[in-house]
């Protein structure tokens, strides 16, 4: 993270005492991740409502031999966003998800099958590179949604 330091306020890079530098450095880090940098065309994810029959297929969504921290391992297998719609997932307001075949998404349920569920995209994984906690990544995502409003 130190290598991604960014001087936002003109006083030299100081991620410890300058909020501006700390936030700018974090953004710089997220946009410089080698494999899949931050995508400005896609959000982090969205809260979803599962179909009533989710218990019938929930276990089939789990990854085989996942690698990474527990938050990366707990994500579902990837599916196109349109496939999640076909399974019966909707947004939090019971509206259809966007019909996109070009967007790969995964399901997360940080509090288990009876808790809130989210469909997440690559930007969510990038947040996990910074801090590998589902609670942290979802909190950052939800906060960013509110800031955008």
Question: What are these regions, as identified by a protein language model?
Answer:
Residues 1-39, 94, 98-99, 104-112:
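Alpha-helical segment that forms one wall of the substrate-binding/catalytic cleft
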Residues 16, 20-83:
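Helix-loop elements that line ligand-binding/catalytic pockets
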């Amino acid at each position: 993270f130190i290598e991604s330091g960014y001087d936002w306020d003109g006083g030299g890079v100081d991620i410890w005492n300058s909020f501006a530098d700390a936030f700018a450095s974090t953004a710089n880090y997220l946009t410089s991740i080698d494999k899949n940098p931050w995508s400005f065309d896609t959000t982090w994810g969205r809260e979803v409502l599962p179909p009533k029959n989710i218990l019938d297929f929930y276990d089939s969504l789990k990854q085989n031999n996942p690698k990474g921290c527990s938050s990366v391992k707990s994500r579902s297998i990837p599916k196109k966003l349109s496939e999640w719609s076909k399974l019966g997932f909707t947004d939090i307001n019971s509206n259809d998800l966007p019909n996109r075949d070009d967007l790969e998404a995964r399901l997360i349920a940080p509090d288990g099958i009876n808790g809130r569920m989210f469909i997440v995209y690559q930007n969510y994984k990038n947040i996990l590179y910074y801090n590998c906690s589902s609670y942290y990544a979802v909190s950052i995502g939800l906060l960013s949604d509110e800031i955008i409003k």
